[in-house]
């Protein structure tokens, strides 16, 4: 899955 917001930190992916 994608994590598309700033709170994801290093996991941010769009």
UniProtKB/Swiss-Prot annotation:
What GO cellular component is one of the record's annotations? host cell postsynaptic membrane
State the family named in the UniProt similarity comment for this chain: Belongs to the conotoxin A superfamily.
Annotated positions of the Cysteine amide modification: 14
Substituting residue 11 to A results in: 3-fold loss of activity
Entry superkingdom: Eukaryota
Q: What is the effect of changing residue 12 to H?
A: 33-fold loss of activity
List GO molecular-function terms, semicolon-separated: acetylcholine receptor inhibitor activity; ion channel regulator activity; toxin activity
Q: Where in the cell is it found?
A: Secreted
Query: Which organism is the protein's source?
Result: Conus magus (Magical cone)
Q: Give expression by tissue.
A: Expressed by the venom duct.
Acetylation listed as a keyword: no
How does it get modified after it is made? Amidated; synthetic peptide with a C-terminus free is 6-fold less active than the amidated peptide.
What is the disulfide pattern of this chain?
3-8, 4-14
What's the impact of mutating residue 2 to A? 4-fold loss of activity
Q: State the UniProt keywords alphabetically.
A: Acetylcholine receptor inhibiting toxin, Amidation, Disulfide bond, Ion channel impairing toxin, Neurotoxin, Postsynaptic neurotoxin, Secreted, Toxin
> Quick one: effect of changing residue 5 to A?
3-fold loss of activity
Task: Give the protein's function.
Answer: Alpha-conotoxins act on postsynaptic membranes, they bind to the nicotinic acetylcholine receptors (nAChR) and thus inhibit them. Specifically blocks mammalian nAChR at the alpha-1/delta binding site. Shows very low potency in blocking the alpha-1/gamma binding site.
Q: What is this protein called?
A: Alpha-conotoxin MI
Q: What is known of its domains?
A: The cysteine framework is I (CC-C-C). Alpha3/5 pattern.
């Amino acid at each position: 899955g994608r994590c598309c917001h700033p709170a994801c930190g290093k996991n941010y992916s769009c």
